[in-house]
């Protein structure tokens, strides 16, 4: 344990926190271009075909980003916006593509949690047309 005199001479060094999303370089979102759009399988207890894209960012990084929601219109050379946020059952996927911005279309027919998927508010007449009631 250092003495008070030693602490006066040289204060304690603060521990540096390692970022979970280094490719964003401290920004909330980053723009990038899809270099490859494909599906991959999740870790052990789960089973699915998860939609992911390899994205070349403006920060110079190339990262793997998850495409949330049902259905998407992304292909190679699509310009996308990504945010931080990992996918627990996909190793190496630490970013999410933001739906409804740039070349990424919002999720069609989304009624709840629309803001997370870039879906517009349905018109009052459309709710009755689908035959769904609360």
UniProtKB/Swiss-Prot annotation:
One of its GO terms (molecular function) is tRNA binding. Keywords: Methylation, Ribonucleoprotein, Ribosomal protein, RNA-binding, rRNA-binding, tRNA-binding. Coiled coil: none annotated. PANTHER family: 30S RIBOSOMAL PROTEIN S12 FAMILY MEMBER. One of its GO terms (cellular component) is small ribosomal subunit. One of its GO terms (biological process) is translation. It comes from Thermosynechococcus vestitus (strain NIES-2133 / IAM M-273 / BP-1). This is Small ribosomal subunit protein uS12. Residues 113-122 have a biased composition (Basic residues). Residues 103-134 are annotated as: Disordered. Part of the 30S ribosomal subunit. Contacts proteins S8 and S17. May interact with IF1 in the 30S initiation complex. Belongs to the universal ribosomal protein uS12 family. The modification 3-methylthioaspartic acid is found at residue 89. With S4 and S5 plays an important role in translational accuracy. Interacts with and stabilizes bases of the 16S rRNA that are involved in tRNA selection in the A site and with the mRNA backbone. Located at the interface of the 30S and 50S subunits, it traverses the body of the 30S subunit contacting proteins on the other side and probably holding the rRNA structure together. The combined cluster of proteins S8, S12 and S17 appears to hold together the shoulder and platform of the 30S subunit.
């Amino acid at each position: 344990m250092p003495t008070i005199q030693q602490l006066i001479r040289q204060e304690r060094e603060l521990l540096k926190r390692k970022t979970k999303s280094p490719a964003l370089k401290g920004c909330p979102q980053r723009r990038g271009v899809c270099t490859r759009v494909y599906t991959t399988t999740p870790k052990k207890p789960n089973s699915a075909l998860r939609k992911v894209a390899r994205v070349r960012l403006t920060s110079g990084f190339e990262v793997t980003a998850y495409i949330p929601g049902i259905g998407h219109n992304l292909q190679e050379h699509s310009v996308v916006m990504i945010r931080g946020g990992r996918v627990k059952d996909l190793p190496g996927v630490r970013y999410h593509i933001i739906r409804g911005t740039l070349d990424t279309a919002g999720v069609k027919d989304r009624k709840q949690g629309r803001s997370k998927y870039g879906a517009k508010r349905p018109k009052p007449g459309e709710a009755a047309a689908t035959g769904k009631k609360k």
